Amino acid sequence: IDKNSRYIGGAILPGLRVSLDSMSSNTAQLPRISLDTPKKVIGKNTVDCMRSGVIFGNAAMIDGMLSRIEEELGGPATVIATGGIAKAVLPLCMRKINNK
């Protein structure tokens, strides 16, 4: 939404659960797992590696998207994240994001 309250566009990203489910359903050996935040970015086993990739990877993706959006807009953007699982990844983002 711009300074004149007009909707100018946005982006839709795959959710955490969709990403995690896709890994297990579209590969032969990766298990279906719960979406718990790993303690470290570098996983030591398959489950922690999957969780790290999804959770920390999505946080980095969001930060990167915001940088690109602000570059395109020529200034700062206010971001509101939606979805029930957003609270799992937002604390790991380096950018400030509102959760509605």
Model-assigned labels for residue ranges:
Residues 19-100:
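ATP-binding/phosphotransfer module of carbohydrate and carboxylate kinases, centering on a glycine-rich
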Residues 14-16:
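A short acidic/small-residue loop/turn micro-motif
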